[in-house]
Amino acid sequence: AATLVLAVAAALVRPTARAGFVAGGPLELAVDGLSAAVVVTVAAVGLLVLVFATGGIRAERPRFFGLMLLFTAAVMVTATATTLTVLLLAWEVMGAASYALIAFRWREDAPVSAGTTAFLTTRAGDLGLYLAAGAALAAPVAGTGAGDRLALDALAGLDGPWLHLAAAGVLLAAFGKAAQLPFSFWLSRAMLGPSPVSALLHSAAMVAMGGYLLLRLRPLLESAGWASGAAAWGGALTALALGAVALAQRDLKQLLAASTAAQLGFVVLAAGAGSVAGGTAHLVAHAAVKSLLFLAAGVWLAALGTEDLGALRGAARRDRATGLPFAVGALALAGVPPLSLWATKDEILAAVESPALYGVVLAASALSALYAGKALGLLLASGPPGTAVREPGEETAEPLRTAPLTLLAAGAAVLGALALPPLAGELKRAVGAPGEPSAGAATLAATAILALAATATAAALAPRLPEPAWARAWLHLETAAHTLAVRPALATARALARFDDTVLDRAVTGTAAGVRRLASWASAADRSGVDRAVRGVADGARYLGELARRPQTGQLHQYYAQALVLLTAATVLLLLLR
């Protein structure tokens, strides 16, 4: 609660905090119009998810809540970072915390494998931020220090190929975190984490930060030219393809996971098309909708022990305390007016100029209504109750369950006002985009009719809607990633290991053996040559000493005789020399 109060205060005051870090690269956080909306959203959704988890998480509570708070803090720092230095620090902590939360049940193999897949997949995209930082530092900019070059606002001013490298790196990092094509499959695996983790991860936290990064760096995309189109088309195609994936799912959490990637596709599209305000409104509204839906799914998973839509048939009708908020969230996800995602999608659609892109976005919007209608139709249908297999540690006390769901349902119902007059104009001014287009009455009416018709059709035909295997398998994206990236990487690693063993290790081992032999030879030479010479000198000195000692008898008459001999010899020598 204190974090939410501080977030609201920061949104009103718009503070800036700065501290020294490394030479030329200070740590700086700032709240502006865009980050204010995101910070308040993260704090509000995080608070409600944690309240829900208070009644639902029984095992290892200190570790769970500590990781959730760390995760939320990293998201808040990501949203307020003004330099690549701070952004990278928060980005890394956010990724590490997500791994720990997805793999929270670390004694089980499946969650650990899921956390590893999510972590490594997003890490592959994270390399793009390092590419962007390298481009910013390498670019020739006169009169600026490293800190100025690494400022997010300065990236749009890079010249030549450095600008395009930075844009490519940012797109790669954002697509990885936002689960856009081709990275989307990691969201499917992330469903093995606890339900509150899924609710926060998919709504206001890590996945949302991918879209937020592109909204923040819209000037960079615009300066690079091609990057705007790449973001727009990448987001639109993800919304379309993952919408088809969501429609084919038989598992509620898998349907919601695919819809997360699809809905973030609209945010990425907004960044590319130049609808920063529309993307922000959609990001905020989607956070309320998706956290609500995941928490409700967690309630039914705990109560019935299943996520299968067939087994959950009629669950929302029987459990009205959960079913009514879920229905509000599902209708909002479908884009049914006047609920939140109806107007926010149209605000984004208003910025799309390409007819082909417009058609793709309309089709993706229709798919949103279809997959939301499918889930709603099955969960509201009459039928036998699911098998009661309650999972210990996942039950949620009634007040701690209903209060967050009710508040999130209220947000899912009203947050679309951010994309409607007069709040739409205020939001555009707050994010510094007063000239962005708005959806007209005709567009709003047409999309409303489309959403209502598609939702009603899907709800009526829910059990008979097509579920192609390629879509149910998430487009086989994980298989493709293993084929195109993982297996070649492992094969390369094995080849390098063999090269290391057969060439490098052999060279090192051979060198060591040669050095040992040389040392052995040197030791033998030392023993046979140097040691013998030293001993010879010592023996000679000892022999000479013995010779010199013989005349030393201690007898005086012998000394006289020796002196007489020496004197005689010296006299003879002198006579001979003359």
Residue spans of the language-model regions?
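Juxtamembrane "helix exit" motif at the C-terminal ends of alpha-helical transmembrane segments
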Residues: P338-S340, A417-E426, L567-R578
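Aromatic-capped, Gly/Pro-kinked transmembrane alpha-helices
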Residues: V431-P437, L465-R578
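Short aromatic-rich membrane-water interface segments that cap or initiate transmembrane helices
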Residues: A23-A37, A156-A167, A350-G359, P434-A441
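Membrane-interfacial helical/loop segments at transmembrane boundaries in membrane proteins
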Residues: A17-G24, D148-A156, E347-A351, P422-A439
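Hard-cation-handling environments
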Residues: E394-A454
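Hydrophobic transmembrane alpha-helices and their helix-loop junctions in integral membrane proteins
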Residues: L48-L87, A96-A388, P392-G393, A417
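Membrane-entry segments of alpha-helical transmembrane domains in multi-pass membrane proteins
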Residues: E28-T41, V77-A90, A227, A281-V284, ...
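Alpha-helical transmembrane segments and their helix-start/interface "positive-inside/aromatic belt" motifs
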Residues: A1-A2, T116-D126, R317-P325, E395-A409, ...
